Amino acid sequence: MSSGGLLLLLGLLTLWEVLTPVSSKDRPKFCELLPDTGSCEDFTGAFHYSTRDRECIEFIYGGCGGNANNFITKEECESTCAA
């Protein structure tokens, strides 16, 4: 195979990897945790993955504590947990 063909194949494989959604078996276990507002009172918007709704949902986070199912952006939540 020519170097151009190998480069094209590499590009297609990379694109496939990026666009393939996370399957539930590959999803980190912490994505199954319920949202936890934490123990502080610096209330800001955050996102958690809802296994019931199968999407990332905004919730109010207190700013400290909580659990790992807590993301600053919806995009970060989706890339980590969404199937």
Swiss-Prot record:
Subcellular location(s) per record: Secreted
Any one Gene Ontology cellular component term annotated for this protein: extracellular space
Position of the signal peptide: 1-24
InterPro entries, per the entry: Kunitz_BPTI, Kunitz_BPTI_sf, Prtase_inh_Kunz-CS, TFPI/VKTCI-like
Pfam families hit by this protein: Kunitz_BPTI (PF00014)
Listed SMART domains: KU
Chief localization: secreted
Disulphide connectivity of cysteines: 31-81, 40-64, 56-77
Residue span, BPTI/Kunitz inhibitor domain: 31-81
Entries under Gene3D superfamilies matching the protein: Pancreatic trypsin inhibitor Kunitz domain (4.10.410.10)
Tissue localization of expression: Expressed by the venom gland.
Single Gene Ontology MF annotation: serine-type endopeptidase inhibitor activity
UniProtKB keywords: Disulfide bond, Protease inhibitor, Secreted, Serine protease inhibitor, Signal
Similarity comment: family membership: Belongs to the venom Kunitz-type family.
Function: Serine protease inhibitor. Does not inhibit plasmin, and does not reduce blood loss in the mouse tail vein blood loss model.
Name of the protein this chain belongs to: Kunitz-type serine protease inhibitor textilinin-5
Organism: Pseudonaja textilis textilis
